[in-house]
């Protein structure tokens, strides 16, 4: 059972750098609820999270304040002979509605080539004072010999190398892409192409390959769509049917979900036909039928009387209703308009393939298999599954945590956390288990993962027990248990490894983690960096001396993350 569970817990997933354990110092609060924190990478001794009054007031643009600070501290950031303006590119500038600060997102570059996984977030107060700099740098790039040479491999050959390593000919969902990066491969730093292979057949995959631009060798790879089973026989692809939105009038229907409960459905009436198309929210919600094939999105679900009680309707009923619940949660709690915060439509496809034991976000929509009836029932029947997967989309459009090692485990944990909080929001038999409603229908009380007791399914509940191998993208579905346990303790309280945590409730848990994921976490955030970002997020929301700040720190103490 344990081996089975280890294989199956990779169900809930999305799309490289692993940082060593860091040391930190946190002192009393600086003005405006900014904690004075210094956290450095233990190996390269560069800052990972610095907060406090980092500069005086300024009338300069926020990015210029950040560049001035980094130039003043260029030795700490190990920029070598380059200045900050040549070492970082501003990729986003947004306003923080809580602190009225300007948040600047930066991408590290070398010779105008982006450095994989090396991004920074900086918070500049309304008066121009720099408050926080968070992120990971690749050090001393001007000293790396391989970066002084010329690339020998072009983009086309890099794609060919990735396809050869893949070992089979897929049916692509979109054309392969390739982009040149500076890439850290352990202690080696070189130019590498990041190749993306996105396909549905013979088994869904969204691979990222790292191909050395000098030698043409594959340095690393990972898949951001995980499958329960191994590669299957090819499922014949049908020609993509028309799946255009319809124009009509809003209607209210009803239907029975996978577990037999009745739900109200927002639909569209057009030419005497009802469609599972909800036009009433800031983002339109569409639900499609793949008809047991693998072509996406399929056909828009239709009905003649707006009553969806047939057995085959159940998966569509839940996919449609739960997508709406998840949208409402993010909109009502955080004023977020869909996963991209810009009203992107929420598309779901059910009855994907035949007996398919998986659900995934493919970068643009949700996809649900029917399960084989023994391991899983239709996977859209789990609200926490839908909340989990759509949260991957939120993360992709905010921190964009790389789906490997600690950043990948943090990515998974955030999806588990918000999948659970969406379940509590709808108040439909909520709990701190993941996938319990759709997993092993013949076994009562079973689930994929437990946030309250990760060890129940073989996952670590303390940093000292973390998985250190390379399987499962470096243990993203395993080490997520450490963050899951911290989150559970933060919401509910309890004593773990001799550390007592005062619970603050699920609502505050969500606010703190959402703020950190959107305004403090960067692509390569480690558990230690996450702690610093979450503590500061709590200080922003509730005050530097608040119980919430204390509880966040204690929750990480309890799982051994400093």
Curated annotation (Swiss-Prot):
Kindly state which keywords UniProt assigns to this record, in alphabetical order: Calcium, Hydrolase, Metal-binding, Metalloprotease, Protease, Secreted, Signal, Zinc, Zymogen
Entries under InterPro entries matching the protein: FTP_domain, PepSY, Peptidase_M4, Peptidase_M4/M1_CTD_sf, Peptidase_M4_C_domain, Peptidase_M4_domain, Zinc_Metalloprotease_M4
Propeptide intervals in chain numbering: 25-245
- Active-site residues are 389, 477 (proton donor)
Which residues take part in binding Ca(2+) 1? Answer: 303, 305
Alphabetized PROSITE patterns for the sequence: ZINC_PROTEASE (PS00142)
Which first-to-last residue range defines the signal peptide?
A: 1-24
Q: Which GO terms describe its molecular function?
A: metal ion binding; metalloendopeptidase activity
**Residues reported in the UniProt entry to bind Ca(2+) 2:** 384, 423, 431, 433, 436
What subcellular compartments does it reside in? Secreted
- Entry binding sites for Ca(2+) 4: 439-440, 446
Give residues annotated as binding Zn(2+).
Answer: 388, 392, 412
Q: Which Gene3D superfamilies match?
A: 3.10.170.10, 3.10.450.40, 3.10.450.490, Neutral Protease Domain 2
Just give the chief location class. Answer: secreted
EC id: 3.4.24.28
User: Is the keyword Calcium in the record?
Assistant: yes
List cofactor names only: Ca(2+); Zn(2+)
Q: Which reaction does it catalyse?
A: Similar, but not identical, to that of thermolysin
GO CC annotation, single: extracellular region
How is the cofactor bound, in the record's words?
Binds 4 Ca(2+) ions per subunit. Binds 1 zinc ion per subunit.
GO terms of biological process kind: proteolysis
**A Pfam family for this UniProt protein?**
PepSY
Entry similarity comment: Belongs to the peptidase M4 family.
Described purpose of this protein according to its UniProt entry: Extracellular zinc metalloprotease.
Record's protein name: Bacillolysin
Taxonomic lineage from the root: Bacteria, Bacillati, Bacillota, Bacilli, Bacillales
Give the encoding gene's name: nprM
């Amino acid at each position: 059972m344990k081996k089975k569970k280890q294989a199956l817990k990779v169900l809930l997933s999305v799309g490289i750098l692993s940082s060593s354990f860091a040391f930190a110092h946190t002192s009393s609060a600086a003005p405006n609820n900014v904690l004075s924190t210094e956290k450095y990478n233990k190996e390269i001794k560069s800052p990972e999270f610095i907060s406090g009054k980092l500069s005086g007031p300024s009338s300069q643009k926020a990015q210029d304040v950040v560049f001035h600070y980094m130039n003043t501290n260029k030795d700490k950031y190990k920029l070598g002979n380059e200045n900050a303006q040549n070492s970082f590119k501003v990729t986003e500038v947004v306003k923080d509605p809580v602190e009225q600060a300007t948040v600047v997102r930066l991408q590290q570059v070398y010779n105008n080539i982006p450095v994989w996984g090396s991004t920074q977030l900086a918070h500049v107060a309304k008066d121009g004072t720099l408050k926080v700099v968070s992120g990971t740098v690749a050090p001393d790039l001007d000293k790396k010999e391989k970066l002084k040479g010329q690339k020998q491999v072009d983009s086309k050959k890099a794609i060919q190398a990735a396809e050869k390593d893949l070992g089979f000919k897929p049916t692509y969902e979109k054309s392969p892409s390739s982009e040149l990066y500076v890439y850290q491969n352990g202690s080696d730093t070189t130019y590498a192409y990041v190749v993306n292979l996105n396909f549905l057949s013979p088994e869904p995959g969204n691979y990222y390959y790292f191909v050395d631009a000098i030698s043409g060798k594959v340095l690393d790879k990972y898949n951001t769509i995980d499958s329960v089973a191994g590669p299957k026989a090819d499922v014949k692809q049908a020609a993509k049917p028309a799946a255009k939105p319809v124009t009509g009038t809003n209607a209210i229907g009803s239907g029975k979900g996978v577990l037999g409960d009745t739900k109200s459905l927002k639909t569209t009436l057009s030419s005497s036909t009802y469609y599972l198309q909800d036009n009433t929210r800031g983002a339109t919600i569409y639900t499609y039928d793949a008809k047991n094939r693998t072509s996406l999105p399929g056909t828009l679900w239709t009905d003649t009387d707006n009553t969806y009680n047939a057995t085959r309707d159940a998966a569509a009923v839940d996919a449609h209703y739960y997508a709406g619940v998840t949208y409402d949660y993010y909109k009502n709690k955080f004023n977020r308009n869909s996963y991209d915060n810009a009203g992107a439509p929420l598309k779901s496809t059910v009855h994907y393939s035949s007996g398919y034991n998986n659900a995934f976000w493919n970068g643009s929509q949700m996809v649900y298999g029917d399960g084989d009836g023994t391991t899983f029932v239709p996977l859209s029947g789990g609200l926490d599954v839908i909340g989990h997967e759509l949260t991957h989309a939120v993360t992709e459009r905010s921190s964009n945590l790389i789906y490997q090692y600690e950043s990948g485990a943090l990515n998974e944990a955030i999806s588990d956390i918000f999948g659970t909080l969406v379940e509590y929001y709808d108040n439909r038999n909520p709990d701190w288990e993941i996938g319990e409603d759709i997993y092993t229908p013949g076994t009562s009380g079973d689930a994929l993962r437990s946030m309250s007791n990760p060890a129940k399914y073989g996952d670590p509940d303390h940093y000292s027990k973390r998985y250190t191998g390379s399987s499962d993208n470096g243990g993203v579905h395993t080490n997520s248990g450490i963050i899951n346990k911290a989150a559970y303790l933060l919401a509910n309280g309890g004593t773990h490894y001799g550390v007592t945590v005062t619970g603050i409730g699920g609502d505050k848990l969500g606010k703190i983690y959402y703020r950190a994921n959107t305004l403090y976490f960067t692509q390569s955030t480690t558990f230690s960096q996450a702690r610093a970002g979450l503590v500061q997020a709590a200080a922003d929301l509730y005050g530097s001396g608040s119980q919430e700040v204390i509880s966040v720190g204690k929750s990480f103490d309890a799982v051994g993350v400093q």
